[in-house]
From Swiss-Prot:
Name of the protein described by the UniProt record: Autophagy-related protein 17
Chief place of localization: cytoplasm
Subcellular location(s) of the protein: Cytoplasm; Preautophagosomal structure membrane
Function noted in UniProt: Autophagy-specific protein that functions in response to autophagy-inducing signals as a scaffold to recruit other ATG proteins to organize pre-autophagosomal structure (PAS) formation. Modulates the timing and magnitude of the autophagy response, such as the size of the sequestering vesicles. Plays particularly a role in pexophagy and nucleophagy.
KW Aminoacyl-tRNA synthetase (keyword) present: no
Membrane topology: Peripheral membrane protein
Keywords: Autophagy, Cytoplasm, Membrane
A Gene Ontology molecular function term of the record: protein kinase activator activity
A Gene Ontology term for the protein's cellular component: phagophore assembly site membrane
Organism: Debaryomyces hansenii (strain ATCC 36239 / CBS 767 / BCRC 21394 / JCM 1990 / NBRC 0083 / IGC 2968)
Family named by the database record: Belongs to the ATG17 family.
Gene Ontology BP terms: autophagosome assembly; autophagy of mitochondrion; piecemeal microautophagy of the nucleus
Length: 487
């Protein structure tokens, strides 16, 4: 049915439909490209960039944790080393040295009279105290060696104190300060920006099964709107295509006027209405296209800002990772080389020590052993040596001499007298019966003591007169010395 529509009108509609369809197709092509570009940027490009940022942040965290562990470990070791050294010095070494000084002072006060010395020859009693100047117990120990030992200890202690100070200063200046002022500060700044970038600004946590448009309102809005607009393009383009097809059928109708042609069923009234609506449809399509393009512009603007932040953050991370590498290669290496050099000095000792000992422990053990030895030396000198010397030099010799005198004057005398009487009686009884040519028993020499030779009794024998012992000046001096030591 032509419904009063002539051939020229249909041709005009057909030309209009063709032009509009061509323009719509171009517009849809551009719109589709814009949709794909926007979707790629939001769904693929942005997550990839954020994933790379997260990868870089994870690498930074790993390096930062490693560096923090090293710095904290070295700082703790340094503090423990200084503390242990100071504790050992204050708790063990200083008291040990004080104890040694005390016992040496006590040894210096313990006098040793000249008559106690082996190489002193006493020519006259009156000169006993003047032959050799009295000494003290310190004269009989190696004070030079002790002084050398204590001097070496003081040198070692001073060197260790200086080295600990140097290590602490180097630790603070070369390790801790660069770590805290540069590394830690930059790290916290990066993590702050990362947190602002991810959950606050973009609202994304990069979970593998979560798309970004589900997490961010703006991105979600753009993607949902584009999805809806894409669906609107299809029916509008289909309407224009269908309208153009109908116009072509209408043109064929007038050209052939074949009743059997299916175009004979063309509804020119509908065709007229579609032709009238076509500008509005094109306008609506153009509006949809403008929105799609505008969304692409909005997306580029959004991502331009975010990509700039992401690139800046990545650059900061790379710089900090590079600083970490340089920090470990220079600051930490310099400090560790110094530690090794100092440890070598810490391990040097002027005396022999066990493999499981430190020089400080060896010094403390040696000083303690010396103090114990000299304490025993002083104690034995006062309480044992002088008493034993007096006993062996005077008490026991007197006892021995008294026993010997008593034995000679009593037991031996009676024994000799009894033997003499026995022999005399025997000769009187039996001698006349023995020929003179025989040796008579009574004529044999009777055993007798002609001379008694003793040793070790000189100190008491010279003062033994008329069966009594007299105290010599030496004995009196030694006795007085013993009494003095017991006070």
């Amino acid at each position: 049915m032509s419904s009063g529509v002539d051939r020229d009108t249909v041709i005009s509609w057909s030309e209009q439909a063709q032009t509009t369809l061509q323009e719509a197709k171009k517009m849809c092509t551009r719109a589709q490209a814009s949709l794909q570009s926007t979707t790629y940027q939001l769904v693929t490009q942005l997550p990839e960039r954020l994933q790379f940022v997260t990868f870089m942040v994870d690498a930074l965290k790993q390096q930062h944790e490693l560096l923090t562990s090293i710095v904290e470990s070295q700082s703790r070791i340094r503090k423990e080393s200084v503390s242990q050294f100071n504790v050992q010095v204050e708790r063990d070494l200083t008291p040990a040295l004080a104890e040694l000084d005390d016992i040496l002072a006590r040894l210096a006060k313990a006098k040793v009279p000249s008559y106690l010395i082996n190489n002193v020859v006493h020519e006259l009693e009156v000169h006993i105290d003047t032959l050799v100047e009295d000494r003290n117990l310190c004269d009989f120990i190696s004070m030079d060696d002790i002084k050398l030992l204590t001097t070496n200890i003081e040198i070692y202690k001073a060197n260790c104190t200086k080295l600990h100070g140097l290590l602490e200063k180097t630790m603070n200046e070369s390790v801790i300060e660069p770590y805290q002022i540069i590394a830690l500060k930059k790290y916290h700044n990066i993590m702050k920006q990362y947190k602002e970038l991810m959950p606050v600004q973009l609202g994304m946590n990069l979970a593998p099964d979560v798309s970004p448009y589900k997490l961010n309102n703006l991105i979600n809005t753009i993607l949902k709107e584009n999805s809806s607009l894409e669906h609107e393009l299809v029916p509008m383009l289909e309407m224009m295509t269908n309208h153009y097809d109908q116009c072509v059928q209408g043109t064929l109708f007038f050209n052939t006027k074949n009743p059997k042609d299916p175009s004979g069923d063309v509804n020119f009234e509908v065709l007229r209405n579609d032709a009238l609506e076509l500008p509005d449809v094109l306008k609506e399509l153009n509006t949809v296209y403008d929105i799609i393009v505008n969304n692409e512009v909005r997306t580029k603007k959004l991502l331009s800002s975010e990509f700039s932040r992401i690139d800046s953050l990545i650059s900061m991370i790379k710089d900090l990772l590079e600083f970490y590498t340089d920090y470990k290669a220079t600051h930490l290496s310099k400090y560790m080389i110094l530690v090794l050099s100092c440890d070598e000095i810490f391990g040097k000792c002027s005396i022999a020590m066990n493999s499981n000992q430190t020089p400080l422990e060896a010094y403390i053990e040696t000083i303690t052993s010396l103090s114990y030895h000299y304490t025993q030396f002083l104690s034995i000198y006062k309480s044992e040596y002088l008493t034993e010397l007096f006993y062996e030099q005077y008490t026991y010799p007197r006892k021995y001499l008294a026993k010997l005198t008593d034995f000679l004057n009593n037991d031996m005398f009676h024994l000799q007298q009894e033997e003499y009487e026995r022999r005399k009686n025997w000769l009187a009884r039996y001698g006349e019966f023995i020929p003179n040519e025989f040796k008579l028993p009574g004529e044999l020499n009777q055993p007798s003591i002609i001379q008694v030779v003793t040793e070790g009794l000189d100190d008491v024998q010279k003062d033994y007169n008329d069966g009594k012992f007299n105290e010599s000046a030496e004995e009196i001096n030694l006795s007085d010395l013993i009494k003095t030591m017991k006070l």
